[in-house]
Curated annotation (Swiss-Prot):
Main location: membrane
PANTHER family on file: SINGLE-PASS MEMBRANE AND COILED-COIL DOMAIN-CONTAINING PROTEIN 1
Alphabetized InterPro entries for the sequence: DUF4547 (IPR027875)
Membrane topology: Single-pass membrane protein
GO CC terms: membrane
Pfam family for this entry, one: DUF4547
Coiled-coil region: 6-42
Subcellular location: Membrane
Transmembrane stretches, start-end: 65-81
Protein name: Single-pass membrane and coiled-coil domain-containing protein 1
Alphabetical UniProt keywords: Coiled coil, Membrane, Transmembrane, Transmembrane helix
Source species of the chain: Homo sapiens
Lineage of source species: Eukaryota, Metazoa, Chordata, Craniata, Vertebrata
Length: 214
């Protein structure tokens, strides 16, 4: 075997070794890319979870911090509970075969996560009412945090106590998300549907509280 042949064989073997190393590196890069993608997905999921938890904590704090008289609390609670009952009733009307399996609004909220049929109906009802999931979170938080000390006022009783509940909400509720959700709850009950950018009415204190003669 001459030197040229030996050199050629050595060169081929060297090229094979280089090729094997390149293939190994390519495999490692693919594994790294896969690991990176997994880490990014986990990070994004974790970030969303933290953001959601932070928003829930902020909402809970905002609800607990409300300085309301018993009358004011009862009025806001009345709108909240009527909206939640309305939503639950509409779900049952569209899913009559699931009435026994959806005895409460909480059961609807749980089932919609895994049940597409319930989820589609729920989303359509929210759209019909002009509400979003964030509104439901706010209203449920209010119900859970303050409902145990509140009582329901009928529409007639509410009108006896206050003429413009919008004025009450915009002045007493400082958290914007909670304020917007409560305003939409009022719109759903009084007008049948909420407007995403409600027009905030300005009222004087004389307009807000009816006189004894009225």
């Amino acid at each position: 075997m001459n030197n040229e042949t030996t050199t050629l064989i050595s060169l081929k073997e060297a090229m094979k070794r280089v090729d094997h190393k390149l293939q190994a590196l390519e495999t490692q890069f693919k594994e790294l890319d896969f690991t990176k993608d997994n880490l990014m997905q986990k990070f994004e999921h974790h970030s969303k979870a933290l953001a959601s938890q932070a928003a829930q904590d902020e909402m809970w704090t905002a609800v607990r911090a409300l300085q309301l008289t018993s009358m004011e609390l009862n009025i806001l609670y009345s709108y909240v509970i009527e909206v939640l009952i309305c939503l639950h009733t509409r779900v049952l009307e569209k899913l009559p075969d699931l009435v026994r399996g959806l005895p409460t609004l909480a059961s609807v909220l749980r089932r919609k996560v895994k049940n597409k049929r319930v989820r589609v109906v729920w989303e359509s009802i929210l759209e019909e009412c002009g509400l979003q999931e964030g509104d439901i979170t706010a209203l449920c938080t209010f119900f859970i945090a303050r409902g145990n000390k509140a009582e329901h006022y009928t529409a007639k009783v509410r009108q006896m106590y206050i003429r413009d509940v919008t004025f009450l909400i915009t002045n007493m509720v400082k958290n914007q998300a909670l304020q917007d959700s409560l305003l939409r709850a009022v719109q759903v009950i009084e007008k049948g549907k909420a407007v995403r950018t409600p027009e905030k009415q300005k009222s004087s204190l004389e307009e807000l509280i009816p006189s004894v003669k009225n």
